[in-house]
């Protein structure tokens, strides 16, 4: 995965720079997400790693994407096809999303709770994280009954384990040492 990220980084950075320059960051995010989905399609995958000429591959890919990709996006597809890099489009899309979140001062936070959180609880977590991180927070909530009670919050490098399972694990470690 690290290798794909290394390969994808210059393409994502170039796309992001163009998107910012043309005030089209959201449009580019949608285009790259769509192109990534096309590249992951079971019919398309073998073509991306096959021996199809780069110009034909780019033309085919662009025709499949249709109106979803503008002229600048098509140019990116052509360059990536020429370099045999269309298979890294999902990583390009992911990196672009990270650049976008950083630029917009946003962070995604994964919140795992033992029981489903009410909208009020989600709002309280969001407000607390926004104060702590000085960024706009988008919550991705899920449940895991194995936590017993409480929540685990992951936002970037920050991990807050407020679950009973986590507390029991830490207590067990202290008792064993």
Curated annotation (Swiss-Prot):
Transmembrane segments: none annotated. PANTHER family: ATP SYNTHASE DELTA CHAIN. PROSITE patterns: ATPASE_DELTA (PS00389). It comes from Shewanella oneidensis (strain ATCC 700550 / JCM 31522 / CIP 106686 / LMG 19005 / NCIMB 14063 / MR-1). InterPro entries: ATP_synth_OSCP/delta_N_sf, ATPase_OSCP/d_CS, ATPase_OSCP/dsu. Signal peptide: none annotated. It is found in: Cell inner membrane. The gene is atpH. Pfam families: OSCP. One of its GO terms (cellular component) is plasma membrane. Gene3D superfamilies: N-terminal domain of the delta subunit of the F1F0-ATP synthase (1.10.520.20). GO terms for biological process: proton motive force-driven ATP synthesis. Belongs to the ATPase delta chain family. The lineage of its organism: Bacteria, Pseudomonadati, Pseudomonadota, Gammaproteobacteria, Alteromonadales. This is ATP synthase subunit delta. The keyword Chaperone does not apply. F(1)F(0) ATP synthase produces ATP from ADP in the presence of a proton or sodium gradient. F-type ATPases consist of two structural domains, F(1) containing the extramembraneous catalytic core and F(0) containing the membrane proton channel, linked together by a central stalk and a peripheral stalk. During catalysis, ATP synthesis in the catalytic domain of F(1) is coupled via a rotary mechanism of the central stalk subunits to proton translocation.
């Amino acid at each position: 995965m690290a290798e794909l990220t290394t390969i994808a980084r210059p393409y994502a950075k170039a796309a992001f720079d163009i998107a910012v320059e043309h005030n089209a960051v959201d449009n580019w995010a949608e285009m790259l997400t769509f192109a990534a989905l096309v590249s992951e399609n079971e019919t398309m995958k073998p073509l991306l790693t096959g021996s199809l000429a780069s110009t034909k591959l780019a033309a085919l890919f662009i025709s499949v994407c249709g109106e979803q990709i503008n002229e600048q996006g098509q140019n990116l597809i052509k360059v990536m096809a020429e370099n045999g890099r269309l298979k890294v489009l999902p990583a390009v899309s992911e990196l672009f999303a990270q650049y976008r979140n950083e630029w917009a001062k946003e962070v995604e936070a994964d919140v795992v709770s033992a029981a489903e959180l009410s909208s009020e609880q989600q709002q309280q977590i969001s407000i607390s994280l926004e104060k702590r991180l000085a960024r706009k927070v988008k919550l991705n909530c899920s449940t895991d009954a194995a936590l017993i009670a409480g929540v685990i919050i992951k936002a970037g490098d920050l991990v807050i384990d407020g679950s009973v399972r986590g507390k029991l694990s830490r207590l067990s470690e202290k008792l064993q040492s």
